[in-house]
């Protein structure tokens, strides 16, 4: 898919959301599987000034009830198999409706979008307008919605593309889910902001990754991606000859994984650290020593303070 086509699809989706009564500043919850239409929906919300609210596809009715009450969405975009369940949940909410993303020809968002013009939709938003509400993992209590502004997104990706040397010549291998910061913000934005290319996989599959690595220059993943790749005998320095950077985050990586991957691929993985509330915060260097077991130094314009349980430095 070309960038022109991507813009056309996103614009059609924005107009379809308009037709469903969504206005700038309204929240749009999306609990959908990773797919190209899910990317179109996300970009449509950014372009049109809607607030995108991605949810983990594993969440059940109890969690969804909390998110609906907390986010107060205008629209809940879901899948065919969950439509009836979600419809019942949103009935209790004020002024909220449910729609299927794909899979219900003539009535789903994909079908509604197809009936609209492909003329580019670009609406004026302020830098401090909320672009996305992304819910935290809830490790210390009930999951909370972090309000991420358009400025947050732009400033973070500017730093990352500079730090990690992204350019239009790159091809990112994207096998991450898109309901959290890593896959939705970091991976997508690093590519789209510089006009690079992307190999888009709907889920991680070792054989598919092995087949596509020769076409990629960058891969982002979580530690389990790399341990699973190490289980495949085809992972070699020759296979990875075109890759310039492997990035890992979202969880700590064992030193053994680091060392084995470097031996097998010829590449030292770059670890970094981020949060739902702040995006990326620290990173090991692109040039220079990447220390195993660390997440590097604070990014430019980021301050880090280490405190104890009593918030004392």
List each model region and its residues.
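Conserved AMP-binding A3 loop
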Residues: 2-4, 131-158
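Conserved AMP-binding/adenylation subdomain of ANL enzymes
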Residues: 154-171, 179-218, 232-234
